[in-house]
Every structure is written in structure tokens, then in C-alpha cells.
């Protein structure tokens, strides 16, 4: 069987991802099947397995595509790092997380949380470490703890029919949390706070440029 052309490969991949989100409109994540995906995408099972190992692989890829298309990683990372002028948690949910909010509502919080933590760890590694180096265990503990809290806030806002949270109160909490985070990470990793902030600003610029491409 001939390999699909690049344009056909991209088209089938996108159709399967769109079909995943369409199925999620009516079903919980654990109830979605490959048959339902291929039927919605009007593709066969062979095409599915050419692109993805299983539903978990498709879910992870769908989340990654959504992160890139909605510039979600810069937004979430800005929240965690307390970057000046960053979007609020409420704005992030309301403006950029419609599909991921649906995933949370359909029982996918654990899957989404795992993907967010992986991407955030990668970003902090790029900021704090030279090539070939790794984050120290103490730094990883701090990042894991803080990221879990931010994800909890996002999930809480997602599950509210209409948010009653005061943006000022939430912003104040996040600012306090960010100051603590930068101090603790700097101490654990041995990087001065001003250097961390400089690298965060540089990373934000690169992330936003990539998101616009």
C-alpha cells in the first residue's frame, strides 16, 4: 500500500483530531471508541492506526494541537511565572480553553493535567538549564506543587456555569504565589531571580512568535 502524500497525511490527521472533539461533545472520554472516531471522520481503522497508536495517543496529540493553536502554553506559563501583563485564569478559561474545558467536563482532567505538567516542565528546563542539564529534584518538587495549584484553579473556573470569582482577588493571589515561586525556584536551582525573569521574558517572546506561525 502506497504511503499517503504529505497533504493527505495532514488532512487525515486533522480529521481524526476534529472527530475526537466532535465525539467528546456527546460522550465522556472513557466512552469514546476508535470506531466512533473513524465513523465521524469518515475514515477507516487502518488510517487511524497509521496516525495514532490508540485513543490515548490521539487525546495527547489533540491537546498538544489545541495548546499550539490557542497559544495556551504561553498563557498558562505566564500565570505560573507571574509574567507582567499576563492573562488572568478567568480570561484564560473563557477566551482560550473552550475545547479543553469540554475535555475537563467529560472526565479528562487527569489527562489534561499530565500534559500541562509535561509542557511546563519542558519550559522551565529550557529557562533554567544549559543544554544537556536537568532540573534539580527540589526545583521539580516546587514546579509540580505550583502547577497542580494553577491547574486546580483552571479546573474550578471551568466547572462554574458563570464565574463568581473576583478577578482582582485571583490576580492578587497569583501575584503573591508567583513571587514565592520565583524565590523558591531561584534558591533551589541556584539561579538569581533577575536572571530568571530575563529568561522568562525571552521565552515568552519566542513562544508567542511560534504560536502565531
Indicate where each model-derived feature is located.
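C-terminal peripheral helix-coil segments that are non-catalytic and often amphipathic
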Residues: 156-213
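Short Lys/Arg-rich basic patches
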Residues: 1-6
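Amphipathic alpha-helical segments that line or abut small-molecule/effector binding pockets
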Residues: 79-101, 144, 152, 171
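Short, hydrophobic secondary-structure boundary micro-motifs
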Residues: 32-33, 101-103, 112
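Terminal, non-globular segments
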Residues: 51, 120, 124, 180, ...
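Amphipathic alpha-helical packing segments from all-alpha helical-bundle domains
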Residues: 87-88, 108-133, 137-154, 168, ...
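An amphipathic alpha-helix adjacent to DNA-recognition modules
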Residues: 10-21, 25, 30-34, 39-42, ...
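Secondary-structure edge/capping motif, primarily at the C-terminal ends of alpha-helices
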Residues: 74, 100-103, 127-131, 157-161
Amino acid at each position: 500500500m502506497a504511503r499517503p502524500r504529505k497533504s493527505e497525511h495532514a488532512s487525515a490527521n486533522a480529521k481524526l483530531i476534529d472527530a475526537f472533539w466532535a465525539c467528546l461533545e456527546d460522550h465522556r472520554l472513557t466512552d469514546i471508541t476508535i470506531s466512533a472516531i473513524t465513523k465521524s471522520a469518515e475514515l477507516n481503522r487502518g488510517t487511524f492506526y497509521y496516525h495514532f497508536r490508540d485513543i490515548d495517543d490521539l487525546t495527547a496529540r489533540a491537546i498538544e494541537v489545541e495548546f499550539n493553536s490557542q497559544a495556551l502554553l504561553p498563557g498558562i506559563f505566564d500565570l505560573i511565572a507571574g509574567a507582567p501583563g499576563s492573562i488572568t485564569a478567568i480570561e484564560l478559561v473563557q477566551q482560550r480553553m473552550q475545547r479543553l474545558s469540554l475535555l475537563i467536563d467529560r472526565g479528562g482532567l487527569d489527562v489534561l493535567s499530565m500534559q500541562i505538567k509535561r509542557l511546563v516542565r519542558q519550559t522551565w528546563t529550557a529557562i533554567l538549564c544549559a543544554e544537556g542539564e536537568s532540573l534539580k529534584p527540589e526545583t521539580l518538587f516546587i514546579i509540580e506543587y505550583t502547577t497542580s495549584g494553577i491547574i486546580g484553579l483552571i479546573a474550578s473556573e471551568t466547572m462554574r456555569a458563570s464565574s463568581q470569582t473576583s478577578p482582582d482577588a485571583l490576580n492578587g493571589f497569583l501575584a503573591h504565589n508567583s513571587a514565592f515561586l520565583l524565590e523558591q525556584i531561584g534558591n533551589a536551582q541556584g539561579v538569581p531571580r533577575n536572571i530568571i525573569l530575563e529568561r522568562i521574558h525571552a521565552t515568552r517572546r519566542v513562544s508567542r512568535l511560534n504560536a502565531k506561525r
